[in-house]
Design a protein with these regions (language model features):
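Local sequence-structure signature of Cys/Sec-based thiol-disulfide redox active-site neighborhoods
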Residues: 31-46
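Stable alpha-helical elements in mature extracytoplasmic
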Residues: 40, 47, 64, 96-100
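Short active-site oxyanion
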Residues: 32-33, 57, 87-90
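Short low-complexity, flexible loop/linker segments enriched in glycine and/or proline
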Residues: 5-7, 70-77
Length: 155
């Protein structure tokens, strides 16, 4: 049975289009995160690097984070050295990328997540200078009324 030229061209075109579309299947656009930090803070910069390595697109503002923390609704008592915003949620401190992704997946009614202080061993506070030390810390889910609950505890 002879193969028609029209049929062969059509099949080649369909295969070519499928191959062009293949990289887009399953590909996700990078989630945008905006960060406010002090320009001289090394641990904040380390956290930004870790977010980028985890696939986030990060914009950095080096004017400090006090105003951003207040504007985004994070209580001062839960403060840390940097504040960020992602898809309508606030992030305070050294929040792990896995917890950010969980927050975005679960979409709780909340202000966002906070890791108060600067716990050693948290992302960005885990460099060689700390010699492998890991202190326990908690990622808190911050409610709109300012209260918080444990979102994830790290031993």
């Amino acid at each position: 049975m002879p193969i028609s030229t029209k049929s062969t061209r059509r099949q080649c075109l369909q295969i070519g289009l499928a191959l062009l579309a293949a990289p887009a299947i399953g590909a996700q656009a990078a989630v945008a995160v905006e960060v406010w930090k002090d320009p001289l803070c090394g641990c904040c910069e380390d956290w930004v690097v870790l977010l980028r390595q985890a696939g986030f697109s990060v914009k950095v503002n080096d004017q400090g984070n006090d105003a951003a923390r207040k504007r985004l609704g994070i209580p001062e008592a839960l403060g840390s050295c940097h504040t960020a915003s992602v898809q309508g949620y606030a992030l305070e401190g050294h929040v792990p990328a896995t917890d950010i992704r969980r927050l975005l997946r679960e979409k709780p009614q909340a202000v966002g997540l906070a890791v108060p202080g600067m716990p050693v061993g948290s992302p960005g506070m885990d460099g060689a200078v700390y010699q492998g030390r890991k202190d326990p810390y908690k990622v808190l889910l911050v409610a709109k009324d300012g209260s918080s609950t444990v979102f994830h505890a790290y031993p």
